[in-house]
Structures are given as structure tokens and as C-alpha cells.
């Protein structure tokens, strides 16, 4: 809180552009799309939460791929140097260049990689039931819809042109395929060794790459352990 007599303003103020999205005043569609365009921020928050509570190497690798994807986007933008549409009506943006769209590239990387993970990484389970397959299909459609809506929001809100979000989506999809192959062929064989490092054991970092359906595995193990402890507690009370 500023004290009396300390309200002299600096020469200029700069906003935090990470979550700063502008939309036309009174435009309900633009208001909704402005929130949807924050999809990458929500994804990052989700990843940080998963890593803190799960500490799984594949999740950490996935986040590393997203970070690399952002670095590639920054490099391409500064090489091509194509301006944003309409003379750049938004002043609070991270960079004045718009080719390719970082939001589009981020979301399509996330969606394509998740799609590959669901259908290739989790295909090993032999007891896939109808509901399991339905869950994968619905989740995949949701991921693709989210990527499209975020890309569309950047065009609607005049942050990018259609070509900028299109090439961003292509770049993100290609990066996702490349990183998925690299993770499966190079990193995954190293995960057991990395998980055995003393520092990994100290931070409880684990490798679940050999478990085809982690969700089902955690459910069954937790249920079995809970029943076992309940029986022991019942025996003590008798």
C-alpha cells in the first residue's frame, strides 16, 4: 500500500502478458473466447500439479517437450518476423511477431501428443472394455475441440491470422509426433535407470512406463491396500 506523498508514477507501466487477453467491449462471444484462449495457461497449471503430486517421469518428459515446442516457436517467429494482423491492435503481447501462433502450436502439440499417448502408449492393455475405449474417444474429441477453439479464438480476437494459427498447428503437431517418438525410443528405455538415481529416490520420482493402464493399476492397488488395512484394523479392535 502506498504511503501519502509516494504516488509519483514511473515513466511507463508494462502488464504481465501471460494472462492478458483483450476482447471487444460488449462482445459475449469474444469474452468467452478470451477465456478459452487461456487454455495453455490451464494446461501448464495442470502439469505442475501432476508433477508435484505424481512425480512421474513421462509427465515430466511431456512438459519438457512442451517447453521445447515453445522454444522452437520463439525461434521461428524471430526468423520469419511476420507481423500480427490489423497493424497489431493489441499492445500487451509478448512479441510483435505472429507467425506461427504460439497458442495454436502449444495446444496442437498437447492434443496430438495426448492423442498418440492414448492410442499407442495405452494400447497394451488386454482387458480394454467398451467404456475404456469410449472414454479414449471422447477425451480425444475433447482435446481436438479444445485445440481448435483456442486457435479460433486467436483469429477472432485479432491476435493472429488464419495462416498463422494454421502453421502453428502444423508445427505443433509435427513437434508432438517427433517428441513422442523420441520419448518412446530414446527416453523410455532410460526411465528405469533415471528412477533409480539417488536424487530421484529422494524426490520420490517414479517410472510407470511398463504399466499399460496407470489409472486402473493405481485404482486396484489402492483398493487392495485399503481393504488390507481395514482387515488389520478390524482384527486389532476385536
UniProtKB/Swiss-Prot annotation:
<dbReference type="InterPro" id="IPR039667">
    <property type="entry name" value="Dolichyldiphosphatase_PAP2"/>
</dbReference>
<dbReference type="InterPro" id="IPR036938">
    <property type="entry name" value="P_Acid_Pase_2/haloperoxi_sf"/>
</dbReference>
<keyword id="KW-0256">Endoplasmic reticulum</keyword>
<keyword id="KW-0472">Membrane</keyword>
<dbReference type="GO" id="GO:0006487">
    <property type="term" value="P:protein N-linked glycosylation"/>
</dbReference>
<feature type="transmembrane region" description="Helical">
    <location>
        <begin position="100"/>
        <end position="120"/>
    </location>
</feature>
<comment type="pathway">
    <text>Protein modification; protein glycosylation.</text>
</comment>
<feature type="transmembrane region" description="Helical">
    <location>
        <begin position="162"/>
        <end position="182"/>
    </location>
</feature>
<dbReference type="GO" id="GO:0008610">
    <property type="term" value="P:lipid biosynthetic process"/>
</dbReference>
<protein>
    <recommendedName>
        <fullName>Dolichyldiphosphatase 1</fullName>
        <ecNumber>3.6.1.43</ecNumber>
    </recommendedName>
</protein>
<comment type="function">
    <text>Required for efficient N-glycosylation. Necessary for maintaining optimal levels of dolichol-linked oligosaccharides. Hydrolyzes dolichyl pyrophosphate at a very high rate and dolichyl monophosphate at a much lower rate. Does not act on phosphatidate.</text>
</comment>
<comment type="similarity">
    <text>Belongs to the dolichyldiphosphatase family.</text>
</comment>
<keyword id="KW-0812">Transmembrane</keyword>
<keyword id="KW-0378">Hydrolase</keyword>
<dbReference type="InterPro" id="IPR000326">
    <property type="entry name" value="P_Acid_Pase_2/haloperoxidase"/>
</dbReference>
<keyword id="KW-1133">Transmembrane helix</keyword>
<feature type="transmembrane region" description="Helical">
    <location>
        <begin position="130"/>
        <end position="150"/>
    </location>
</feature>
<feature type="transmembrane region" description="Helical">
    <location>
        <begin position="33"/>
        <end position="53"/>
    </location>
</feature>
<dbReference type="GO" id="GO:0047874">
    <property type="term" value="F:dolichyldiphosphatase activity"/>
</dbReference>
<dbReference type="Pfam" id="PF01569">
    <property type="entry name" value="PAP2"/>
</dbReference>
<dbReference type="GO" id="GO:0005789">
    <property type="term" value="C:endoplasmic reticulum membrane"/>
</dbReference>
Amino acid at each position: 500500500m502506498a504511503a501519502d506523498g509516494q504516488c509519483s508514477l514511473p515513466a511507463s507501466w508494462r502488464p504481465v502478458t501471460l494472462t492478458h487477453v483483450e476482447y471487444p467491449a460488449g462482445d459475449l462471444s469474444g469474452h468467452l473466447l478470451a477465456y478459452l484462449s487461456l487454455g495453455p495457461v490451464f494446461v501448464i497449471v495442470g502439469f505442475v500439479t501432476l508433477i508435484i503430486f505424481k512425480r512421474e517421469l513421462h509427465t515430466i518428459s511431456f512438459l519438457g517437450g512442451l517447453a521445447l515446442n515453445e522454444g522452437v516457436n520463439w525461434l521461428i517467429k524471430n526468423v520469419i518476423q511476420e507481423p500480427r494482423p490489423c497493424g497489431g491492435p493489441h499492445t500487451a503481447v509478448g512479441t510483435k511477431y505472429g507467425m506461427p501462433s504460439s497458442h495454436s502450436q502449444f495446444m496442437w502439440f498437447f492434443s496430438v501428443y495426448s492423442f498418440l499417448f492414448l492410442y499407442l502408449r495405452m494400447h497394451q492393455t488386454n482387458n480394454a472394455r467398451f467404456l475404456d475405449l469410449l472414454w479414449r474417444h471422447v477425451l480425444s474429441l475433447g482435446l481436438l475441440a479444445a485445440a481448435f477453439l483456442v486457435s479460433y479464438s486467436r483469429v477472432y480476437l485479432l491476435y493472429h491470422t488464419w495462416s498463422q494459427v494454421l502453421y502453428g498447428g502444423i508445427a505443433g503437431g509435427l513437434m508432438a509426433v517427433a517428441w513422442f517418438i523420441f520419448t518412446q525410443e530414446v527416453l523410455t528405455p532410460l526411465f528405469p535407470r533415471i528412477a533409480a538415481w539417488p536424487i530421484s529416490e529422494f524426490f520420490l520420482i517414479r517410472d510407470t512406463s511398463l504399466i499399460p493402464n496407470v489409472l486402473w493399476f493405481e485404482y486396484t492397488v489402492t483398493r487392495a491396500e485399503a481393504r488390507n488395512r481395514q482387515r488389520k484394523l478390524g482384527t486389532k479392535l476385536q
